[in-house]
């Protein structure tokens, strides 16, 4: 007896569900699916078969009365969506902040936690106040405690004791020294005020004769009259305020012999007659500053301080008058002195010449210093050099900075820079006219100040 054909149901997209009879009971799922797809004109590769919701193999034998579903295959994508889901799940699991969540009553956990913390803080408020007050009391107690100083250093006490003793000794010694100095000062002043053993007339005569200056021919007659009465004793050397050593002249019946050493500086010295007994008096240098004689020399000559000051004023006035008169020619008066007067006149004229030479040297030095101290106001009146006579920059460098500066300023060029730069700038314009010189080398004109 032939086997009965199996009857199965096929359900798929587009045609619903329909019954299909297989050729035999041993027919496979692949055979009747292939025949059905050929009838529907669709490719078999686009479907997979399910039976009772489960995938079946196409090699299985069909079951009578079973329902087979044809499920279309979906086009597969790139993938990666699953990895995104896995990463998001990991993040959700790692977070511990649940404050945004709500509890069963619908309140957010953030508000619930805040209320709990506030209640706890209110409970601890009293404890905090008590702790703060305790700290304040402890701080106040530390401030009230007196410092514990301990001065038990024997070395310090010994030093204080020795210092007090030394102080007392020093005060006593200082008082003794001060009293001894006062006594010595009084004695020395009394000695200065004592006059030498001479009559009042001799002192007045000597004071009057000291006013004569040895600068001209004045007073020769008075000197001749008193020279016969002078002795042959050597006079003492008079001290000098300017540090010059002068030898006193030897007074004799034949004439006057003197030697004076003038200083090496530029100071001008005048000679003053100081010996009251002769015209060839002791020579003392008098400077232009007005400081004629030191107090020591006045003490030796027996003069008081008041007399010295008045004589200094008188000598200064007479010096100015006789300085102008000494420049005029003076005729020698006929006298009976002869060779003595001629010799004395020669010595005086020699002294005047030396004084005038020293004065001129001092004036020249002062003018030179004034020119050096005001380099900016100096007038460039030197002759310009011939640049064609120089063949290299090195030769121009031998002129020096100031000479190169003057030459550059005379040409209107920039005068700054080092010695080499100035020499190179001046050598570059050698033999060129002013129109041929590079304009960059000219100095910029001075601009007036803005008001």
Swiss-Prot record:
Residues 396-430 form the SAP domain. It holds the Pfam family Sde2_N_Ubi_vert. Disulfide bonds: none annotated. Its main location: nucleus. InterPro entries: RNA_Proc_DNA_Dmg_Regulator, SDE2-like_dom, SDE2/SF3A3_SAP, Sde2_Ubi. The modification Phosphothreonine is found at residues 274, 319. Upon binding to PCNA, the N-terminal UBL (ubiquitin-like) propeptide is cleaved at Gly-77 by an unidentified deubiquitinating enzyme; the resulting mature SDE2 is degraded by the DCX(DTL) complex in a cell cycle- and DNA damage dependent manner. Keywords: Cell cycle, Cell division, Coiled coil, Cytoplasm, DNA replication, DNA-binding, Mitosis, mRNA processing, mRNA splicing, Nucleus, Phosphoprotein, Ribosome biogenesis, RNA-binding, Ubl conjugation. GO terms for cellular component: cytoplasm; nucleus. Residues 302-329, 340-354 have a biased composition (Basic and acidic residues). It comes from the Eukaryota. A motif (PIP-box) lies at residues 39-52. The keyword Cell inner membrane does not apply. GO terms for biological process: cell division; DNA replication; endonucleolytic cleavage of tricistronic rRNA transcript (SSU-rRNA, 5.8S rRNA, LSU-rRNA); mRNA cis splicing, via spliceosome. The record marks 77-78 as: Cleavage. Interacts (via PIP-box) with PCNA; the interaction is direct and prevents ultraviolet light induced monoubiquitination of PCNA. Interacts with FBL/fibrillarin. Interacts with CACTIN. Interacts with SF3B1. Interacts with U2AF1. The PIP-box (PCNA interacting peptide) motif mediates both the interaction with PCNA and cleavage of the SDE2 precursor by a deubiquitinating enzyme. The SAP domain is necessary for specific binding to DNA. Inhibits translesion DNA synthesis by preventing monoubiquitination of PCNA, this is necessary to counteract damage due to ultraviolet light-induced replication stress. SDE2 is cleaved following PCNA binding, and its complete degradation is necessary to allow S-phase progression following DNA damage. This is Splicing regulator SDE2. It comes from Pongo abelii (Sumatran orangutan). The lineage of its organism: Eukaryota, Metazoa, Chordata, Craniata, Vertebrata.
């Amino acid at each position: 007896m032939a086997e009965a054909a199996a009857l199965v149901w096929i359900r798929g997209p587009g045609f619903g569900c329909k019954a299909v009879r297989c050729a035999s009971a041993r027919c496979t799922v692949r055979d009747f699916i292939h025949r059905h797809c050929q009838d529907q004109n669709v490719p078999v590769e686009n479907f997979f078969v399910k039976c009772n919701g489960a995938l079946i193999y196409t090699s299985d034998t069909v079951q009578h009365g079973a329902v087979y579903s044809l499920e279309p295959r979906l086009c597969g994508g790139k993938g990666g969506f699953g990895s995104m889901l896995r990463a998001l799940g990991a993040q959700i699991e790692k977070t511990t902040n649940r404050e945004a969540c709500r509890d069963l009553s619908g309140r957010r956990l953030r508000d619930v936690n805040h209320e709990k913390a506030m209640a706890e803080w209110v409970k601890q408020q009293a404890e905090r106040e008590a702790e703060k007050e305790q700290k304040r009391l402890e701080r106040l107690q530390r401030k009230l405690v007196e410092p514990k100083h301990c001065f038990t250093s024997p070395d310090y006490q010994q030093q204080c004791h020795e210092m007090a003793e030394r102080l007392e000794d020093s005060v006593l010694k200082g008082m003794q020294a001060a009293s001894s100095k006062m006594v010595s000062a009084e004695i020395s002043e009394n000695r200065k005020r004592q006059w030498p053993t001479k009559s009042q007339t001799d002192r007045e005569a000597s004071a009057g004769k000291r006013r004569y200056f040895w600068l001209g021919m004045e007073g020769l007659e008075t000197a001749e009259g008193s020279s016969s009465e002078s002795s042959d004793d050597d006079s003492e050397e008079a001290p000098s305020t300017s540090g010059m050593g002068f030898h006193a002249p030897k007074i004799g019946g034949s004439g006057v012999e003197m030697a004076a050493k003038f200083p090496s500086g530029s100071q001008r010295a005048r000679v003053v007659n100081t010996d009251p007994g002769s015209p060839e008096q002791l020579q003392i240098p008098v400077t232009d500053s007005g400081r004629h004689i030191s107090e020591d020399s006045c003490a030796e000559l027996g003069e008081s301080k008041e007399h010295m000051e008045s004589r200094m004023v008188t000598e200064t006035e007479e010096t100015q008058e006789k300085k102008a008169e000494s420049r005029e020619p003076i005729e020698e008066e006929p006298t009976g002195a002869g060779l003595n007067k001629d010799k004395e006149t020669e010595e005086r004229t020699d002294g005047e010449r030396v004084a005038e030479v020293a004065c001129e040297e001092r004036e020249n030095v002062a003018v030179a210093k004034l020119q050096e101290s005001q380099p900016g106001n100096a007038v460039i009146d030197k002759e310009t050099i011939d640049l064609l006579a120089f063949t290299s920059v090195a030769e121009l460098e031998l002129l020096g900075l100031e000479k190169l500066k003057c030459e550059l300023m005379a040409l209107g060029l920039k005068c700054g820079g080092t010695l080499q730069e100035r020499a190179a700038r001046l050598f570059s314009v050698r033999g060129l006219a002013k129109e041929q010189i590079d304009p960059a080398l000219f100095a910029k004109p001075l601009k007036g100040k803005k008001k």
